[in-house]
From Swiss-Prot:
Belongs to the mab-21 family. The gene is MAB21L2. Required for several aspects of embryonic development including normal development of the eye. Changing R51H: In MCSKS; complete loss of ssRNA-binding activity with the variant protein; shows a higher stability than wild-type in tetracycline-inducible cells. One of its GO terms (cellular component) is nucleus. InterPro entries: Mab-21-like_nuc_Trfase (IPR046903), Mab-21_HhH/H2TH-like (IPR046906), MAB21L/cGLR (IPR024810). This is Protein mab-21-like 2. The keyword Cytoplasm applies. It comes from Homo sapiens (Human). Transmembrane segments: none annotated. GO terms for biological process: camera-type eye development; cell population proliferation; embryonic body morphogenesis; eye development; nervous system development; positive regulation of cell population proliferation.
Length: 359
């Protein structure tokens, strides 16, 4: 048993060195290329409208606010200033979303974003995004990379296609620190010892982002309340939780396996599903010794089995917002074929670790 475990860990480490590191290097190269173009577009936006200041900056060889969706798809979060005159209202009526309401006694004119406030006093995510989209469209025509960058039409999101190969979504957002959403109040679970109180305090201080992007209800049609609402995002908090042990190595292997074998019609699975299931695995195995390098095979196996279970149940709850289902709106047939493909992959890795050489 221990010999089989050791063999799997050896093969996974080899896979990490050969496949995952190559993936990381290729993505890092793409990011540099993509960020040059995006920075140029945002610089042009800022000239037209100084309220949209580019926050895309490189710190320690990684870009602040950039999320890798897949090797050819990225999201850049553009942090906006001055949320101060608004209250954060999170009543759970729209899973995964919240609204920003003008504080009592505050005049509209005190806000930097006065023309985007609705009659009922909400700061509209949709109105801000619509204005930003117009500015980006103009900037794309003027910027020095105009030959290689195009706006993607037929969406209310701000999406650029670069060199016909890459897609970058630019999302206006507010950073919320020092508060924690009511819809995430059940975290951390009282009976689960992970993460410890110090890490919990760090994560809550880190806060979350409010993004201006489409949030669909079950019908797929947006109500006006939804289009004014902001989407909650916990990227930095999640990254902080995954520090230590073999957690990030495990995530890297999962992402590489997804990119190579689970990129399926209907796009049932993305890297965020992998990250979410890794966080649940951390709760199931709360001790740091469970995340020793020697346990990499067990942890990976546990996550793949959990993924199959979620795909079969057609439900994958968000880690911080359990009322939000990350499979919502995905075609059932796509989830079914992903479950079968994940099962084949898990069986292959477990019964024949050497197969990782070919995966």
């Amino acid at each position: 048993m221990i010999a089989a475990q050791a063999k799997l860990v050896y093969q996974l480490n080899k896979y990490y060195t050969e496949r995952c590191q190559a993936r990381k290097a290729a993505i890092a190269k793409t990011i540099r290329e993509v960020c040059k173009v995006v920075s140029d577009v945002l610089k042009e936006v800022e000239v037209q409208e100084p309220r949209f200041i580019s926050s895309l900056s490189e710190i320690d060889a990684r870009y602040e606010g950039l999320e890798v969706i897949s090797p050819t798809e990225f999201e850049v979060v553009l942090y906006l200033n001055q949320m101060g005159v608004f209250n954060f209202v999170d009543d759970g009526s729209l899973p995964g979303c919240a609204v920003l309401k003008l504080s009592d006694g505050r005049k509209r004119s005190m806000s930097l974003w006065v023309e985007f406030i609705t009659a009922s006093g909400y700061l509209s995510a949709r109105k801000i995004r619509s204005r930003f989209q117009t500015l980006v469209a103009q900037a794309v025509d003027k910027c020095s990379y105009r030959d290689v960058v195009k706006m993607i039409a037929d969406t209310s999101e701000v999406k650029l296609r670069i060199r016909e190969r890459y897609v970058v979504q630019i999302t206006p957002a507010f950073k919320c620190t020092g508060i924690w959403p009511r819809s995430a109040a059940q975290w951390p679970m009282p009976h689960i010892p992970w993460p410890g109180p110090n890490r919990v305090a760090e994560v809550k201080a880190e806060g979350f982002n409010l993004l201006s992007k489409e949030c669909y209800s079950l019908t797929g049609k947006q109500s006006s309340a939804e289009s004014d609402a902001w989407v909650l995002q916990f990227g930095e908090a999640e990254n902080r939780l995954l520090m230590g042990g073999c957690r990030n190595k495990c995530l890297s292997v999962l992402k590489t396996l997804r990119d190579r074998h689970l990129e399926l019609p209907g796009q049932p699975l993305n890297n965020y599903h992998m990250k979410t299931l890794l966080l649940y695995e951390c709760e199931k195995h709360p001790r740091e010794t469970d995340w020793d390098e020697s346990c990499l095979g067990d942890r990976l196996n546990g996550i793949l089995l959990q993924l199959i279970s979620c795909l079969q149940c057609r439900r994958c709850p968000h880690y911080f917002l359990p009322n939000l289902d990350l499979f919502q709106g995905k075609p059932h047939s796509a989830l079914e074929s992903a479950a079968k493909q994940t099962w084949r992959l898990a069986r292959e890795i477990l019964t024949n670790p050497k197969s990782l050489d070919k995966l």
